[in-house]
């Protein structure tokens, strides 16, 4: 019996540009690592770049499980955390390094959900988290892209379409769909394609059973000439989707991500976001861009990101931990307020409340 021919989704070569960014080697343990490093950074006072680096490196080495790790791996941690999450600010001209507002925010609040929402809210391409050469490629392609915002807009569009078709299903997206239909298509990342069009493409592709990853496609080839695995091709979109899940914006089922139903306010904040770091705008008009000039923008980028740490923008709602809003939520919310504001609360009161929340979550 002849095998059925497989149809693959094709992004024309002229529109294909692979989005990539720093991928922490500790991603599988990101929650513990970020909380630990934020706490440790806040123990280091403003000091010379050399002293800060030394104390910062020692803190990485003391993280559980790192003591016997090779120095090369530890140094990778040292560069990845500030590149992506900006936990410290380094002024090489003045020879001063100090812990950033981002690290202080996470240290003081111990709220990784809120921290990652704020991180995702400002995360964009181009951004100072990228190497200058990669920035040049992004700018030459005319890319201006905020991943979390686009993903949420696409999911909202998909929900509307499904509702109009009378479907009770919720729109979802996989890392593979996000990679090919959003991240690596310049028409999308440069803003020439709407969220409605992207959602419709994904739904149409599902109906037609169109596949995405093709190991024989030239776009799947690495610099060595070998085909990248599906995981390699989809890892960057997958990272953002995972961060959005940890940030309690999305939930994942069998590799597909959909919006959290009780986080509408936060989701709308992302969908309606018009903020943008404009430090790279002048380079879009240039034919020849010097990497040194791009490097000068990096401190401005991290200043922008740190100034974006506004606690009032997103607040973790205890009801999102317990579940959908119903009668029991009101009881929990009232009891939480009583315990938090009471002058004569006891550790037993707090313990009982915590146990109740855990039971509700389970």
Q: Where are the regions that the model predicts?
A:
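Acidic-basic catalytic patches of nuclease active cores, encompassing PD-(D/E)XK
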Residues: 341-362
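Donor-sugar nucleotide-binding helix/loop cap in glycosyltransferases
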Residues: 2-325
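A short, surface-exposed helix-loop junction/capping segment
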Residues: 58-59, 215-224, 330-348
């Amino acid at each position: 019996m002849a095998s059925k021919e497989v149809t693959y989704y094709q992004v024309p070569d002229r529109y294909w540009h692979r989005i990539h960014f720093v991928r922490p080697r500790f991603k599988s343990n990101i929650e513990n690592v970020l909380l630990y490093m934020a706490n440790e950074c806040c123990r280091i006072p403003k000091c010379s770049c050399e002293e800060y680096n030394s104390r910062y490196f020692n803190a990485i080495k003391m993280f559980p499980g790192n003591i016997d790790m090779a120095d090369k791996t530890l140094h990778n941690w040292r560069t990845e955390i500030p590149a992506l999450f900006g936990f410290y600010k380094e002024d090489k001209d003045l020879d001063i390094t100090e812990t950033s507002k981002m690290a202080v925010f996470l240290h003081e609040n111990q709220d990784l959900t809120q921290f990652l929402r704020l991180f995702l809210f400002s995360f964009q391409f181009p951004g100072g988290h990228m190497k200058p050469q990669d920035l040049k490629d992004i700018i030459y392609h005319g890319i201006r892209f905020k991943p979390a915002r686009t993903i949420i807009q696409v999911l909202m569009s998909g929900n509307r379409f499904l509702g109009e078709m009378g479907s009770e299903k919720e729109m979802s997206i996989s890392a593979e769909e996000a990679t090919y239909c959003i991240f690596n298509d310049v028409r999308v990342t440069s803003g020439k394609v709407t969220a409605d069009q992207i959602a419709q493409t994904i739904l149409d592709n599902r109906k037609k059973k169109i596949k995405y990853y093709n190991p024989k496609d030239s776009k799947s080839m690495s610099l060595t000439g070998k085909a990248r695995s599906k995981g390699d091709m989809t890892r960057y979109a997958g990272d953002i989707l995972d961060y959005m899940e940890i940030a309690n914006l999305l939930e994942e089922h069998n590799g597909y991500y959909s919006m959290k139903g009780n986080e509408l306010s936060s989701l709308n904040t992302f969908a309606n976001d018009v903020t943008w770091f404009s430090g790279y705008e002048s380079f879009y008009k240039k034919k020849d861009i010097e990497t040194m000039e791009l490097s000068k923008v990096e401190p401005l980028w991290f200043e922008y990101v740190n100034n974006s740490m506004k606690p009032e923008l997103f607040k973790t709602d205890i009801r999102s931990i317990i579940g959908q809003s119903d009668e029991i939520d009101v009881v929990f919310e009232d009891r939480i307020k009583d315990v938090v504001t009471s002058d004569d609360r006891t550790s037993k009161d707090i313990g009982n409340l915590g146990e109740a929340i855990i039971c509700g979550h389970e």
